[in-house]
Design a protein with these regions (language model features):
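Catalytic core of DAGKc-family lipid kinases
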Residues: 30, 39, 78-193
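Short Gly/Thr/Asp-enriched flexible loops that form oxyanion-binding sites at enzyme active sites
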Residues: 68-82
C-alpha cells in the first residue's frame, strides 16, 4: 500500500506533529509506504490534495481535525470530482467530530482502519453560495453557533476559553432573524437563532447536534433553533451534548436531499468548523460520493 499523508502540524494545539511522527513509524512497521506533507499555511492542503488526487496513491490520509478534513476533501474535489482514491482519517484535532461517526475512538482505531485497506462509501454535503462552492463532510451551520465560532477565533490566544468568551459576547447581543428555507420542495419561514445542516451526528467534539444522522443514508439532517430568550438559550446548549435538545419546543428537525436558505441579514457560514461564505445558500447531499477507509 502506498499512501499520501497530509498533516496539519498545528492541529490539536500542536499535537499534529507528534501524531504524525507516531503514525509514520506505525506505517513503516506494517510495511506501508507513506509520503507525508506538512501544511505550512491555510489552504496549503487544498492545493496538495487537488494535485495529488490523480496521483499513483492507494489513498490520501488527512491527519488533523475537522478543519483539516475540510481542506483535504475540497482539494480532492477540485482536482477530480470523481474522487478516484479513498480517504483515510487520522484524528489529531481538538474536536475530531467526524471521526467518531466512523467508529474511531483512538489513534489505534484509525490506524488499523487504514492499514486494513477496506473502504466504505459515505455521503458528502455540497453548498453553493454567492461567492464560493464547497463540500462538507461533517456539518454546515449559520446563526448563533457560527457567530460564536467567528467571535471565538478573534480570542484564540485565550486557548480553550475562547469559546466561553464567544458564547458570552454573542448571547449578550442575541437577536433572532427572519429565515426562509425550502427542503425538498417544502417552503418554511421562521424567526431563527441558528441552523445546523448535518451529515454526521456530532460537532464540536461530543456535541450530538443531529442524533439520528447517518453518514451513508443519502440524507442531510437539519436542526433549527427558533426565537427564544437568552436564559432559555443558555439552558439549551448543555442539552446538545446529550442530544436531548430536539425535545425542546423551539427546536425543529428536518431531513432532506436538496434545500435552500435565505436570511436577513446575510449570515456567515461555518462548514466543518471553518469560516467560508454567507447566506443565501443552496445545499445538496452527494450520496456515496467518497470512499473512506473503515
Amino acid at each position: 500500500m502506498k499512501l499520501l499523508m497530509l498533516t496539519n502540524p498545528l492541529a490539536g494545539r500542536r499535537r499534529g506533529l507528534a501524531v504524525a511522527e507516531k503514525s509514520l513509524e506505525m506505517f513503516r512497521q506494517r510495511g506501508i509506504t507513506v509520503e507525508n506533507v506538512f501544511s505550512d499555511r491555510p489552504g496549503h492542503l487544498v492545493e496538495v490534495a487537488a494535485r495529488e488526487v490523480n496521483g499513483d496513491w492507494d489513498g490520501i490520509v488527512a491527519l488533523g481535525g475537522d478543519g483539516t478534513l475540510f481542506e483535504v476533501i475540497n482539494g480532492m474535489m477540485k482536482g477530480n470530482p470523481d474522487l478516484p482514491i479513498p480517504l483515510g482519517v487520522l484524528p489529531a484535532g481538538t474536536g475530531n467530530s467526524f471521526s467518531r461517526d466512523l467508529g474511531i475512538r483512538t489513534h489505534a482505531d484509525a490506524f488499523e482502519m487504514i492499514a486494513a485497506g477496506a473502504t466504505r462509501r459515505i455521503d458528502l454535503g455540497e453548498c453553493q453560495c454567492a461567492d464560493t462552492r464547497f463540500v462538507f463532510i461533517n456539518i454546515l451551520g449559520f446563526g448563533f453557533v457560527s457567530d460564536v465560532a467567528q467571535k471565538a477565533y478573534s480570542y484564540r490566544q485565550w486557548g480553550a476559553l475562547n469559546y466561553v468568551i464567544g458564547v458570552f459576547i454573542i448571547t449578550r447581543s442575541l437577536k433572532s432573524y427572519p429565515l426562509e428555507f425550502e427542503i425538498d420542495g417544502r417552503s418554511i419561514q421562521r424567526d431563527n437563532i441558528f441552523v445546523e445542516i448535518s451529515n454526521s451526528r456530532k460537532t464540536g467534539g461530543d456535541m450530538i447536534m443531529a442524533p439520528d444522522a447517518l453518514i451513508d443514508d443519502g440524507l442531510l439532517d437539519v436542526v433549527i433553533l427558533n426565537k427564544l430568550s437568552r436564559l432559555r438559550l443558555l439552558s439549551a446548549l448543555p442539552r446538545i451534548f446529550a442530544g436531548t435538545h430536539l425535545k425542546m419546543k423551539e427546536v425543529e428537525h428536518f431531513t432532506g436531499r436538496s434545500m435552500s436558505f435565505r436570511t436577513t441579514p446575510a449570515k456567515v457560514l461555518t462548514p466543518d468548523g471553518e469560516i467560508a461564505g454567507t447566506t443565501p445558500i443552496t445545499v445538496n447531499v452527494l450520496p456515496g460520493k467518497i470512499r473512506v477507509f473503515g
